[in-house]
C-alpha cells in the first residue's frame, strides 16, 4: 500500500491495498466499518499532471506559470466532466456506479489529485483467470452489456472503448461496463492522439477517422464476444500457432479494417 486518503476526502474510508494502475492513476480497495459491518469500495486516484516530467514539459513550452496552471486546470475540468457523466448511470445494474468524487489541489506546486469512489467489483480479467467461460456465460455477458449500451444510447453517450479491461463482475454475477473515458480523455489530450479506444476491438470507421455513431460500441462488444468463443484469439489470428507475433497481430488488424469477412469463431454455437 502506497497511498493514504487525505483526512479531508473521506475520513471514514481506509485504503487497504492497490488493485490496479494505469498511465494516469491508481485504483485502491478501501473499506469502512459501521455497527460491526464492513463495506468496500474502489477508489481511483487520478493525478494531474501525472508525473514531474509532464509538468516540466508543459512549463518549457509556456510563457508563464499562470499559463501552465490554466492548461492543467483544463484537464482537471475535463476529467470532472467525465465523472459527472457517470451520474446518469447511478443505479443502473449493468454500469459501474460512481458513488462520490473529490478534487484536492496541491498547495506547494501545480497539481491535483482527483479521488473517485466507485462500487467495488471484480475485474473481468480476474474473473476469467483459471476458469473457462461457457457459451451461456458469454451469452449472459453479451445481454448484460447490451443493456448497458442501450441505456448509453438513451443518454446519447458513446463509450468508444469496449474491451475486456473495462468489464467488471458483481458478487451476484452481473457483468458491468466501466471506464467511461476519464483516463482515455486525458491520454488523448496529453499525447495528441486523434483515435480513441483500443485498436484490437475498435470499429473500422473509428480507426479510419471517419464519422461514427453508437454502433461502434456494438461492434466492439461483438469482437469481445468473438474472442471469448474463439479460444481467446481475435479474428484472423491463427489458432494453430502458440506464439503470436506483432506482425501476426498487425496482419489480422489490417484484414479486419479492410472489411474482410470474419472467420467463424472456433466455438461458435448453432445460430
Locate predicted features.
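Conserved activation segment of eukaryotic-like protein kinases, specifically the C-terminal portion
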Residues: 192-206
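Short beta-strand micro-motifs within the conserved protein kinase catalytic domain, predominantly
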Residues: 97-111
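Activation segment signature within eukaryotic-like protein kinase domains
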Residues: 141-142
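Conserved short submotifs of the Hanks-type protein kinase catalytic core
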Residues: 109-124
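Conserved catalytic-loop aspartate of Hanks-type protein kinases
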Residues: 217
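Catalytic-loop of the protein kinase fold
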Residues: 153-169
Amino acid at each position: 500500500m502506497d497511498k493514504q486518503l487525505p483526512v479531508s476526502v473521506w475520513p471514514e474510508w481506509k485504503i487497504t491495498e492497490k488493485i490496479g494502475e494505469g498511465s494516469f492513476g491508481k485504483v485502491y480497495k478501501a473499506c469502512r466499518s459501521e455497527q460491526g459491518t464492513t463495506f468496500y469500495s474502489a477508489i481511483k486516484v487520478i493525478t494531474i499532471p501525472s508525473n514531474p516530467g509532464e509538468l516540466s514539459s508543459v512549463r518549457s513550452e509556456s510563457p508563464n506559470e499562470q499559463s501552465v496552471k490554466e492548461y492543467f486546470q483544463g484537464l482537471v475540468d475535463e476529467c470532472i466532466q467525465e465523472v459527472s457523466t457517470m451520474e446518469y448511470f447511478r443505479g443502473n445494474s449493468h454500469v459501474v456506479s460512481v458513488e462520490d468524487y473529490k478534487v484536492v489541489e496541491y498547495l506547494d506546486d501545480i497539481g491535483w489529485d482527483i479521488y473517485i469512489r466507485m462500487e467495488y467489483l471484480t475485474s473481468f480479467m480476474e474473473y476469467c483467470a483459471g476458469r473457462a467461460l461457457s457459451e451461456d456465460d458469454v451469452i449472459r455477458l453479451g445481454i448484460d452489456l447490451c443493456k448497458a449500451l442501450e441505456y448509453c444510447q438513451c443518454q446519447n453517450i458513446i463509450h468508444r472503448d469496449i474491451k475486456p479491461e473495462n468489464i467488471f463482475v458483481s458478487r451476484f454475477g452481473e457483468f458491468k461496463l466501466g471506464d467511461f473515458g476519464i483516463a482515455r480523455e486525458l491520454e488523448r489530450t496529453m499525447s495528441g492522439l486523434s483515435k480513441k479506444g483500443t485498436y484490437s476491438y475498435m470499429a473500422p470507421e473509428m480507426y479510419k477517422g471517419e464519422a461514427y455513431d453508437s454502433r461502434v460500441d456494438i461492434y466492439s462488444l461483438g469482437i469481445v464476444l468473438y474472442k471469448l468463443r474463439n479460444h481467446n484469439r481475435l479474428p484472423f489470428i491463427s489458432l494453430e500457432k502458440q506464439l503470436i507475433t506483432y506482425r501476426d497481430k498487425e496482419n489480422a488488424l489490417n484484414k479486419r479494417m479492410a472489411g474482410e469477412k470474419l472467420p467463424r469463431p472456433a466455438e461458435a454455437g448453432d445460430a
